[in-house]
Amino acid sequence: MSDANSATLCAIMKRHVFAVACSLALAWSTAARAQLAPANDMGVALGHMHLAVKDVEAHKQFFTTALGGKLVTNGPLTLIEFPGIFVMLRQADAAAPPAGSVIDHFGLVYKDIEAARARWKSAGVKYDVGDVNPNQGYVFAPDSGIRVEVFGDPSLPGPVSMDHVHLFPAEADIKAMQAWYAKVFGGFPGQRQRVARPGVIEVDYFHRFNFSFSAGMGKPAPTKGRAIDHLGFDVKNLDEFEKRIAALGVKFEAPPRVVPNTSTKVAFLTDPWGTYIEVTEKLAPISATR
């Protein structure tokens, strides 16, 4: 079994309701892997979360100083790097909060959650502690309605890591959505234990990270124009990916294009439930490639 596939299996075992705990160290075996995870068998890796916010500088400070991300650049692109994900920001005066759209929030995991909370308290960053599980809670970004779920895992090899993206389709759509992300992007369907309270959640795994699917309150709004405007996948070859999804009946909204002054290619599509998705090739800076 390849190193990448072993790491994926390790994460699945760790999160699955019937599995035993499993070390995450395999996924951190090289410095390069502390950024985007290795691509799956379809050449796809989780790439980024793109946020539309009124005050870009305040959110930049929130995701770096408060949450522990690292500011990096790829030509004209500014990214905030966490192991397994990039966060990107764009200025928008009137983006609605994520609540009520397909993507409600995304989650980070901390090696020492109490130390992180002490840092947030000292800096005046708003956060809460879970009523059922005090190891879990949310941290709230300034004035955008964005909340980041956080929890602690002392076995984490580094101080912080990406964990999940939480989508809230109508309950009747959960299985179809899970199957769609597996078919189009190569997610590995399964379940994980809830963190906030007892129970299980349907997921698609992307390496050791996951897309979590929970029932929303009816049909959710599309993400485009919300504070969590879209999510991103990074692929090894965007042109080949376009051909593969076209055979599945999935089309980009426009042909792939190269971002000026970079080697990064991008294209966009929307899933059947209103999630706006950017697909990139070579998003990571050379110093932060997987």
Report each predicted region and the residues it spans:
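N-terminal secretory signal peptides that target proteins for export/translocation
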Residues: 1-14
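Bacterial N-terminal signal peptides
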Residues: 19-29
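Vicinal oxygen chelate
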Residues: 26, 33-41, 117, 121-169, ...
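Mature N-terminal segment immediately following signal peptide/propeptide cleavage
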Residues: 40-75, 79-82
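Eukaryotic phosphotyrosine signaling hubs
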Residues: 46, 103-105, 164, 227-230
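Short, surface-exposed ligand-recognition loops at beta-strand->loop->(often short) alpha-helix junctions
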Residues: 50-55, 108-111, 167-174, 234-236
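Amphipathic alpha-helical segments
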Residues: 54-70, 116-123, 172-189, 247-248
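Mid-chain, structured segments of secreted extracytoplasmic proteins
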Residues: 79-123
